[in-house]
């Protein structure tokens, strides 16, 4: 049922509503200014025809024109109604008018402005849209402009209207200067490169600018260089040369790229000679090999392209004489550039470190065959290199400079160079000493022997003011008189060219200055010996010994004692003994062996045998533990040769007490073997018994086999039983040594059982003992497997009153002629004894073996 509402004529057209609308109408009449009531009514009428719904919105907005909710829903609904219509449809204009009416009251609402602007953009009405954006910016407070500009900029970029976009971006940058990169990118895309370069230069010079894209200042600078260098015809408002050169001083780690950009700018501008000047300036100023490589490669590519362009032009237009000359000039210039590369690279390295001696030598080698350049290079090098900052030996430059003059026959110039070198304040005395030695060698090469001696004597002359060799506060000229290098050369020359007295004076002076080495002392003594001054040579040794301590004095003592013995033999035996005692006093164990052997040899040849034995005995105590075994072997050998093998018994006993278990075991075997050869079977057996205490049957099977063979040859059943008893006792002893088992576990056990060190850091105490216990059980099982099968005999109790004669008689009855040997340790129980009492055999409890209680 349709009801016609009665309203005044002024409110026509008449409102038509249905019966279902009456409750909402009544509610509105009661609360006509309630937004919620109108929204409930509108929600109810969502399915009604669009005109009815629009009419309802209009009624509500007439009463509530400042309601944002109503306007927002109304405008959204009106836009949705025309969404699929053509933009030329008059309905679009109605919707636009609705928006305009809304902004009379809602001009401070950015959401409505954004929706309206987007709606206009969809219609394609550029001017109307632009003006609406401007109205929105004017209407809204500046704090809300950031909501409008993104859509505004998108609108500006969507149309090919660069002037409009530029004006809009300029306004936007006043609000958001940090978005300059976006504007620059737009300018590049619209080919307005001049303004883009200006903006980019402004950004680069602004230290407070922070790139939204995360670019560094250098990256922005590099973009600017690429932009202005690659577009010289479009960038007119900036001084490109000044900008790039400013970057050269600002970004010193990227000089290569900046120089190439500057040259590229001139190349694209057509100023080829200017570009070539830039390249030449660059390769003479860059400081790193990387920058040099970039500039040089770009320079070479430029020259190649110029040659290729010239050849192409000549081939198209025909060759002329001028073209040929120009082409040859370009080719010659390119070849010269390539040939200069090593020298230019060397210049770069020298600019990095002008005090690098090796690089100066390489530079001289690059000028090979050009004497004038070599002289200039050497002159520049010796003037540039500071000896206190030099890398390498600075004196080699002076020496090589003089050698160059010498090789070219200019000896006077070479002498002048070396003379100047002797006045240079080097950092090290060795440098000046090397120069003086080169002065002497120069004269020797040209057979000016007297002049060479004169120069070296001058070098070693005492200065007016004495100084210590390592006193850095004194110039090296005052310290060179203590240089062993100069004195050694002077001593060699004096030996070859001088007199005996002059040579002796030189060596004495070296010893007085306390700069001699053991070799110098030995050379001096040998020199005196060659001239038959034996006592003087011994005095030289004595002076050398007073200068040095062990171990440096070792060679002097060895040579001195050898020479003394060869000279006097046994004629001055007491003096020789005193010398040996003096040498051995304070001698480290490492060097004692040689001296003791030499001392013992002296006593054997010229002294007393008992003295020699005493020396050997002292030697066994004085040498290092690692050398004691060898020393005992020598001692035993010499004692056997001098006194006989019986005299070595005491030596063997002492060696067994002193040496380690391994060496003591070998000594015991040799000792026992000697006693066997002497027929002392009981002594040999006692030695085997003593040695068995340090021989684990599991690891020293060779010893037990040797003892077994010995008993087979020389023993009887009782001795065999005793050996087996000792073996069981020793094995039981080793089985109860926990520390030994741990070491054996580390050596012998494989990965199956693991080691104590394999336990986790948190596992300790009982876990360690469990692991050792497992290993002990495994070793016991292995020993059980290694034993031969036991005889099926029973355990008997033997009466204690049975005499030894009865036992022996029974043994003979069982086996009258043969001794039964077996591998089993318990075979001695197989023979039945008289008056035996049969006992029942039971298993031994596991607790007897002493294993730890398990958790």
UniProtKB/Swiss-Prot annotation:
Alphabetically ordered keywords of this record: Acetylation, DNA damage, DNA repair, mRNA processing, mRNA splicing, Nucleus, Phosphoprotein, Repeat, Spliceosome, Transcription
Primary location: nucleus
Pfam families cross-referenced by the UniProt entry: HAT_Syf1_CNRKL1_C, HAT_Syf1_CNRKL1_N, HAT_Syf1_M
Region called Disordered, residue ranges: 808-855
Residues bearing PTM N6-acetyllysine: 420
SUPFAM superfamilies (UniProt xref): TPR-like
Residues with Phosphoserine modification: 851
Disruption of the gene: reported phenotype: Complete embryonic lethality before 13.5 dpc. Already at 3.5 dpc, the number of homozygous mutant embryos is lower than expected.
Localization (cell): Nucleus
Cellular component aspect of the GO annotation: nucleoplasm; nucleus; U2-type catalytic step 2 spliceosome
Keyword Transmembrane helix: no
Biased composition (Acidic residues): 820-834
Listed InterPro entries: HAT, HAT_Syf1-like_N, HAT_Syf1_central, HAT_Syf1_CNRKL1_C, Syf1-like, TPR-like_helical_dom_sf, TPR_rpt
HAT repeats: from-to residues: 15-47, 48-80, 90-122, 124-158, 160-192, 198-230, 235-268, 270-305, 369-407, 498-530, 532-566, 571-605, 643-677, 679-713
GO biological process: blastocyst development; cerebral cortex development; DNA-templated transcription; mRNA splicing, via spliceosome; transcription-coupled nucleotide-excision repair
Entry function: Involved in pre-mRNA splicing as component of the spliceosome. Involved in transcription-coupled repair (TCR), transcription and pre-mRNA splicing.
PANTHER family: PRE-MRNA SPLICING FACTOR, PRE-MRNA-SPLICING FACTOR SYF1
Quaternary structure (record): Associates with RNA polymerase II, the TCR-specific proteins CKN1/CSA and ERCC6/CSB, and XPA. Identified in the spliceosome C complex. Component of the XAB2 complex, a multimeric protein complex composed of XAB2, PRPF19, AQR, ZNF830, ISY1, and PPIE. Identified in a pentameric intron-binding (IB) complex composed of AQR, XAB2, ISY1, ZNF830 and PPIE that is incorporated into the spliceosome as a preassembled complex. The IB complex does not contain PRPF19.
Similarity-based family: Belongs to the crooked-neck family.
UniProt protein name: Pre-mRNA-splicing factor SYF1
Organism in which the protein naturally occurs: Mus musculus (Mouse)
Upper lineage: Eukaryota, Metazoa, Chordata, Craniata, Vertebrata
């Amino acid at each position: 049922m349709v009801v016609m509402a009665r309203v005044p004529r002024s409110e026509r057209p008449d409102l038509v509503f249905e019966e279902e609308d009456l409750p909402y109408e009544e509610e509105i009449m009661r609360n006509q200014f309630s937004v919620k009531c109108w929204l409930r009514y509108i929600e109810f009428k969502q399915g009604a025809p669009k005109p009815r719904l629009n009419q309802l919105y209009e009624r509500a907005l007439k009463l509530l024109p400042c309601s944002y909710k109503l306007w927002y829903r109304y405008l959204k609904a009106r836009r949705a109604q025309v969404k699929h219509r053509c933009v030329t449809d008059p309905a679009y204009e109605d919707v636009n008018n609705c928006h305009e009416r809304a902004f009379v009251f809602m001009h401070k609402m950015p959401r409505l402005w954004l929706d309206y602007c987007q709606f206009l953009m969809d219609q394609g009405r550029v001017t109307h849209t632009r003006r609406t954006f401007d109205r929105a910016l004017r209407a809204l407070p500046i704090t809300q402009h950031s909501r409008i500009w993104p859509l505004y900029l998108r609108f500006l970029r969507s149309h090919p209207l660069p002037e409009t976009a530029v004006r809009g971006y300029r306004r936007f940058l006043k609000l958001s200067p940090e978005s300059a990169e976006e504007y620059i990118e737009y300018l590049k895309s619209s080919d307005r490169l001049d303004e883009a370069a200006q903006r980019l230069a402004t950004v680069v010079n602004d230290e407070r600018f922070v790139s939204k894209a995360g670019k560094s200042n250098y990256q922005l600078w590099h973009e600017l260089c690429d932009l202005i260098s690659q577009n010289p015809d479009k960038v007119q408002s900036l001084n490109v040369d000044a900008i790039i050169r400013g970057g050269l001083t600002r970004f010193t780690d990227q000089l290569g790229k900046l120089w190439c950009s500057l040259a590229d700018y001139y190349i694209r501008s057509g100023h080829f000679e200017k570009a070539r000047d830039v390249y030449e300036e660059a390769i003479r100023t860059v400081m790193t090999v990387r920058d040099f490589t970039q500039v040089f490669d770009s320079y070479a590519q430029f020259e190649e392209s110029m040659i290729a362009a010239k050849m192409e032009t000549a081939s198209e237009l025909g060759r002329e004489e001028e073209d040929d000359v120009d082409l040859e000039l370009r080719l010659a210039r390119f070849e010269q550039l390539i040939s200069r590369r090593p020298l230019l690279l060397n210049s770069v390295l020298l600019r990095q470190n002008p005090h690098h001696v090796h690089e100066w030598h390489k530079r001289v080698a690059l000028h090979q065959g050009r004497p004038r350049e070599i002289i200039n290079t050497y002159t520049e090098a010796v003037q540039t290199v500071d000896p206190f900052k030099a890398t390498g030996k600075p004196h080699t430059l002076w020496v090589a400079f003089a050698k160059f003059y010498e090789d070219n026959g200019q000896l006077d110039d070479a002498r002048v160079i070396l003379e100047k070198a002797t006045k240079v304040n080097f950092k090290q005395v060795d440098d000046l000493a090397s120069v003086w030695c080169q002065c002497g060698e120069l004269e020797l090469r040209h057979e000016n022997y007297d002049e060479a001696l004169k120069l070296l004597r001058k070098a070693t002359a005492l200065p007016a003011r004495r100084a210590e060799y390592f006193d850095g506060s004194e110039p090296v000229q005052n310290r060179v008189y203590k240089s062993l290098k100069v004195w050694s050369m002077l001593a060699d020359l004096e030996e070859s060219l001088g007199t005996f007295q002059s040579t002796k004076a030189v060596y004495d002076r070296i010893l007085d200055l306390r700069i001699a080495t053991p070799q110098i002392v030995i050379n001096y003594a040998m020199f005196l010996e060659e001239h038959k001054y034996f006592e003087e040579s011994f005095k030289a040794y004595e002076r050398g010994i007073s200068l040095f301590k062990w171990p440096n004095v070792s060679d002097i003592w060895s040579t001195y004692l050898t020479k003394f013995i060869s000279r006097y033999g046994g004629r001055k035996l007491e003096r020789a003994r005193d010398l040996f005692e003096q040498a051995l006093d304070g001698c480290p164990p490492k060097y004692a062996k040689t001296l003791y052997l030499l001392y013992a040899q002296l006593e054997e040849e010229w002294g007393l045998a008992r003295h020699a034995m005493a020396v050997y005995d002292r030697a066994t105590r004085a040498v290092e533990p690692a050398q004691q075994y060898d020393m005992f072997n020598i001692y035993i050998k010499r004692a056997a040769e001098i006194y006989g093998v019986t005299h070595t018994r005491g030596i063997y006993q002492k060696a067994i007490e002193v040496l380690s278990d391994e060496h003591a075991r070998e000594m015991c075997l040799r000792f026992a073997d000697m006693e066997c050869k002497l027929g002392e079977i009981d002594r040999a057996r006692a030695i085997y018994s003593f040695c068995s205490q340090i021989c684990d049957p599991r690891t020293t099977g060779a010893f037990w086999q040797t003892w077994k063979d010995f008993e087979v040859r020389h023993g009887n059943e009782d001795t065999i039983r005793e050996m087996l008893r000792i073996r069981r006792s020793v094995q039981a002893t080793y089985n109860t040594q926990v520390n030994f088992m741990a070491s054996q576990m580390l050596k012998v056990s494989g990965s199956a059982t693991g080691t104590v060190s394999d336990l986790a850091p948190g596992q300790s105490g009982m876990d360690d003992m469990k692991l050792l216990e497992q290993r002990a059980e495994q070793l016991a099982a292995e020993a059980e497997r290694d034993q031969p099968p036991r005889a099926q005999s029973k355990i008997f109790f033997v009466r204690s009153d049975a005499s030894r004669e009865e036992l022996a008689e029974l043994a003979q009855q069982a086996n009258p002629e043969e001794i039964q040997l077996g591998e089993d340790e318990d075979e001695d129980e197989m023979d039945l004894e008289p008056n035996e009492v049969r006992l029942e055999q039971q298993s031994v409890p596991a607790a007897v073996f002493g294993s730890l209680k398990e958790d």
